[in-house]
Amino acid sequence: MDVAPPAEQATLAAAAGLTSSFGHRAGLHKVKDDLNLSASAALVIDQHSGAVLFRKNAEAVLPIASLTKLMTALVVTESGQPLDQVITISEDDVDGERHSRSRLRVGTSLNRGEALHLALMSSENRAAHALGRSDPRGIGNFVQAMNRKAKALGMANTVFVDPTGLSNRNRSTANDLSLLTAAASQNPLMGEYSTTPQHELAASTGQVLRYNNSNRLIKNPQWDISLQKTGYIVEAGWCLVMSTKIAGHDLLVVLLDAGGKGSRSADAERIKRWVASQMKVANQGEGGNPRDLRG
């Protein structure tokens, strides 16, 4: 889960004076779009041609919650660190900011590959933090590496401050996140780990921990998703990035600040139906890609 449970997090946020997302407070959700999306910001791009099929507030800088873990994973996999190296969950990995729950108890040992798997598929916060903390360069330098990678990818309006996304200071735009998603989609291991429907971890504590994918669309046979990441904190709303095939086209989909977990999935379904209908029209003789709809 991204940060759990949402009701508990909302209570904590309300106590701190936070009752709505940054996007909602800025009025971005009120911007009308032809698909009637819940998300405050959205972007759909044809991965091969680069054509923008749909956009809504794609330049808005917003908190991105656990979408941050996509960059965490990219830095880990490109660092050459051995995935079979054992790391141990420590008190430093416990979330003291939002008090999100985790079944990885302090003292649990797992290898780096397992931590990577859990961070991507089920958005495990302690696993993600442990990935950064266990980097030989130290967690501060690890976060700097995340920001250097963002700059190298052309993510001009993005900043990372931790490996988990728990801080609302991890911020980006739909435009920038499409660049990150495109880069991550070229990493086969990240694609495999992020789209695993279920996974069992034989923990060093003797427990068998069962994890489910945080994206409900993964188990839907009508979807063909090769990479994905979900995210949620109150300030970010419900977020999702995907590399997915729709109507024979490889697309990048970015949704930021949807109004709820169900709304996030419903937005993705609206996009899927719209793209499929537009491709059908194109195949019947009008040609080209779906028209660019700007929110």
Label for each model-derived stretch:
Residues 1-2, 292:
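Polycationic, low-complexity disordered segments in secreted or periplasmic proteins
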Residues 2-175, 179-188, 246:
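Active-site-adjacent loops and short helices of periplasmic peptidoglycan-processing enzymes
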Residues 155-159, 165-295:
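Domain-terminus/edge residues, biased toward the C-terminal soluble/receptor-binding domains
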